[in-house]
Each structure stands twice: as C-alpha cells, then as structure tokens.
From Swiss-Prot:
This is Metallothionein-1G. Residues 1-29 are annotated as: Beta. A divalent metal cation 2 binds at C7, C14, C16, C27. Keywords: Acetylation, Cadmium, Copper, Metal-binding, Metal-thiolate cluster, Phosphoprotein, Zinc. The modification Phosphoserine is found at S59. A divalent metal cation 5 binds at C35, C37, C38, C51. Belongs to the metallothionein superfamily. Type 1 family. Metallothioneins have a high content of cysteine residues that bind various heavy metals; these proteins are transcriptionally regulated by both heavy metals and glucocorticoids.
Length: 62
C-alpha cells in the first residue's frame, strides 16, 4: 500500500497502512498525529510543522 496513503479527496473511505505519513494522509482511517509532538487530531498539522523534541509540543499545535 502507498505509504503516503493519498486519497482522491479528503473524507474518502480507504485504509491506511501503519506507516502512512499523516502530514499527507487524507484517509479517515488514519488516526496518528502528524508528528511525534502533535496530538492526534491537530487541526493545523496539514500545514506542516517542525518538532524540536519528541516530548515538546510544536508551535502549530500550541
């Protein structure tokens, strides 16, 4: 399966592999955060973010 798990449009039903890159993943089944310091469901993750540390929240999710 495509590791980026890209769908034609957001909300399209499909299955993501555990290795999907959620920054680009538009699948509803993908529940992972976009990066290690962002909580699942971070609304701004699609804009991209840079994590300073695994346990530190990035500015986009603050």
């Amino acid at each position: 399966m495509d590791p980026n798990c890209s769908c034609a449009a957001a909300g399209v039903s499909c299955t993501c592999a555990s290795s999907c890159k959620c920054k680009e993943c538009k699948c509803t089944s993908c529940k992972k955060s976009c990066c290690s310091c962002c909580p699942v469901g971070c609304a701004k993750c699609a804009q991209g973010c840079i994590c300073k540390g695994a346990s530190e929240k990035c500015s986009c999710c603050a």
